[in-house]
């Protein structure tokens, strides 16, 4: 009798549909609760991690770059390739090389975006006042720290600020830089976060230091006596408004008006714009004037060209015969970005929280920060001296009784 073939065992099919409790259910929730739980943490993380400057005057991306350059020995050393700096900065800043290099460009001397640049540059770093003058790739340019950075890093190795681990716990980085002057007010700082934006205008370094000394000696000191107004790197004239400046100094909010500077070449009937507001670019001005000429709103201009070269910014405007250049400029100020407003919104991170502060409050916070740095430096130096004194006392005992030793 023939045997029956054994039937193959049926294997159970895997269940790919895993059960998730609560999946597919729609729960009602007040929008205020949802915003508090989801939106606010996201907004705060953007503000704290990249958008707003802190009391030392730097955003995290600026601080990571400058500290990396300091550790590379670029404060007193020779220029090195920008690509090398960008690669080293990635140990602290987990972003693409493009974003890091763009940060370096803005901090550089060649870009002319800052009143007191932090990076000495060699090569083409573009110009802040021109969209078309793009910066060269990082492999073609070189950089090192400017001498002013000595005031940022002079005490950093004396426990003046806290250090935290980097993103992968392989090294540490400072939470702040122990700047010996109020750098937050010396260079412009613009940051756009979520639902909030910061715009800190720059002031003259000497005037900021005089104002700080004045407020330290007398809390009722009038900042307008020494701090005459913002000082922008591109020049341009500041239309002085004492009431508006006083409002900015006390509240941190307001605006200042900037006006381009020009000179007139009578022989060639040419207006030469040599300084423009920091809020605009050469291309934006030329495009606006061309649009006004085409629209028939300006008939006095025969030709306009960009004459910017290695010697600096210049816009040439040829005018028709019999036109008064001063009257034409007044018209251009009114209709073009040759006169523009710089909005001030002094949002600064203090102990991890965004605060809007005027010049008085900013200097007060900076003085408190600097006093803490000096106190910590003094404690560090004292501990070192005590250790040395202990060794010297031991050495003294040995020398006084050398036979027993």
Residue ranges of predicted features:
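Catalytic phosphate-handling regions of large nucleic-acid enzymes and associated NTPases
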Residues: 2-252, 314-316
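C-terminal interaction appendages of subunits in large macromolecular complexes
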Residues: 2-15, 22-26, 30, 190-192, ...
């Amino acid at each position: 009798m023939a045997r029956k073939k054994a039937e193959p065992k049926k294997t159970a099919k895997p269940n790919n549909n895993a059960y998730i409790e609560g999946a597919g259910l729609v729960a009602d929730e007040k929008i205020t609760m949802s915003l508090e739980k989801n939106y606010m943490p996201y907004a705060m993380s953007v503000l704290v991690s990249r958008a707003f400057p802190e009391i030392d005057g730097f955003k995290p991306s600026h601080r990571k770059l400058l500290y990396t350059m300091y550790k590379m020995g670029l404060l007193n050393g020779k220029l090195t390739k920008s690509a090398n700096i960008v690669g080293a900065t990635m140990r602290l800043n987990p972003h693409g090389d493009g974003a890091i290099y763009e940060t370096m460009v803005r901090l550089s001397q060649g870009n002319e975006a800052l009143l007191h640049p932090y990076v000495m540059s060699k090569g083409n770093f573009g110009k802040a006042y021109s969209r078309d003058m793009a910066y060269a790739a990082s492999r073609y340019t070189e950089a090192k720290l400017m001498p002013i950075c000595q005031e940022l890093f002079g005490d950093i190795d004396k426990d003046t600020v806290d250090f935290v681990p980097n993103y992968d716990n392989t090294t540490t980085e400072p939470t702040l830089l122990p700047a010996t002057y109020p750098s937050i007010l010396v260079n412009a700082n613009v940051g756009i976060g979520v639902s909030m934006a910061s715009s800190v205008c720059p002031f003259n370094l000497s005037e900021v230091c005089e104002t700080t000394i004045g407020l330290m000696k007398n809390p009722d000191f009038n900042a307008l006596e020494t701090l005459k107004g913002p000082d922008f790197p591109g020049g341009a004239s500041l239309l002085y408004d004492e009431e508006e400046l006083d409002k900015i100094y006390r509240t941190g909010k307001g605006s200042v008006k900037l006006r381009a500077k020009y000179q007139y070449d009578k022989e060639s009937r040419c207006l030469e714009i040599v300084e423009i507001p920091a809020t605009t670019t050469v291309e934006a001005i030329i495009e606006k004037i061309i649009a006004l000429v085409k629209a028939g709103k300006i008939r006095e201009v025969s030709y306009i060209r960009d004459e910017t070269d290695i010697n600096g910014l210049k816009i040439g405007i040829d005018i028709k015969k019999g036109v008064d250049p001063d009257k034409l400029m007044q018209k251009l100020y009114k209709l073009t970005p040759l006169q523009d407003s710089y909005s001030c919104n002094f949002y600064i991170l203090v102990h991890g929280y965004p605060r809007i502060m005027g010049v008085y409050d900013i200097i007060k916070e900076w003085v408190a920060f600097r006093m803490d740095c000096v106190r910590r430096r003094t404690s560090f130096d004292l501990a070192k001296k005590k250790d040395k004194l202990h060794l010297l006392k031991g050495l003294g005992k040995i020398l006084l009784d050398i036979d027993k030793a």
